[in-house]
Amino acid sequence: MKFKTLALVLLASASFAACNTMPAHPTMVTNDVVTGNNGMTLYVFDKDVAGSGKSTCNGACAENWPPLVASDFAMASEGGSADLTLITRDNGKQQWALKGKPLYYWANDKKPGDKTGDGVKGVWHVAKP
């Protein structure tokens, strides 16, 4: 019985520690641009309908525009703002959205501060607070 109790305590401690290593907020604002916690610029896609709860960027699109994916246990309240919500992607993963629009990185941005995806094909734009 002592072994089971110890095992449960260790499991609970490990789970709690894992939760505490997640960033407090998935995004931040840097120079009036919304970025991920890694400092990389985030973008919105004109073809995504705000508030639809869906992303229209899947497959090859998502390879070029990786979504800002949430952890499996994320809750919208963790976003730190009422403007940050979660949507469910076609593959079942959760993605962060700003004002109802899913957020994406641009694969060609190489370092924090890059904004090379702004205006691509006239439908990709830097996410603004």
Ranges and model annotations:
Residues 15-16:
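Bacterial Sec-type N-terminal signal peptides, specifically the leucine/valine-rich hydrophobic h-region
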Residues 10-12:
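Short, linear, compositionally biased motifs with a strong N-terminal bias
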Residues 4, 8, 19-129:
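Compact beta-sheet-dominated domain cores in extracellular/mature segments
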